[in-house]
Amino acid sequence: MELTPREKDKLLIFTAALLAERRKARGLKLNYPESVALISAAIMEGARDGKTVAQLMHEGQTILGREDVMEGVPEMIQDIQIEATFPDGTKLVTVHNPIV
């Protein structure tokens, strides 16, 4: 199977998000890469489901709360930008202050 670099990046994000989901389900607090991966994967999946950029920008702020992540992580993540594939093409989604 031949994958483009973009496809490889998407699979890496998805794999990291699965790991983050499992750790969160076990009650562990997520670190920086796990938090970014989980939010990014949710945005990518929402885009595939047909949600709008505005919906995803809002939903991106509701995926994780301070109680879900290690101390200091919310301050480290000011913005998350992810290129997501929508039914009408690829668009950049920016989530400001994703962990409140």
From Swiss-Prot:
Reactions catalysed, as given in the entry: urea + 2 H2O + H(+) = hydrogencarbonate + 2 NH4(+)
Record-linked InterPro entries: Urease_gamma (IPR012010), Urease_gamma/gamma-beta_su (IPR002026), Urease_gamma_sf (IPR036463), Urease_subunit (IPR050069)
Cellular compartments annotated: Cytoplasm
GO MF term (any one): urease activity
Protein keywords: Cytoplasm, Hydrolase
Domain of life: Bacteria
EC nos: 3.5.1.5
Pfam families, alphabetized: Urease_gamma (PF00547)
Protein's GO biological process: urea catabolic process
GO-annotated cellular components: cytoplasm
Pathway(s) annotated for this protein in UniProt: Nitrogen metabolism; urea degradation; CO(2) and NH(3) from urea (urease route): step 1/1
Family: Belongs to the urease gamma subunit family.
Binding partners and assembly: Heterotrimer of UreA (gamma), UreB (beta) and UreC (alpha) subunits. Three heterotrimers associate to form the active enzyme.
Protein name: Urease subunit gamma
Organism: Polynucleobacter asymbioticus (strain DSM 18221 / CIP 109841 / QLW-P1DMWA-1) (Polynucleobacter necessarius subsp. asymbioticus)
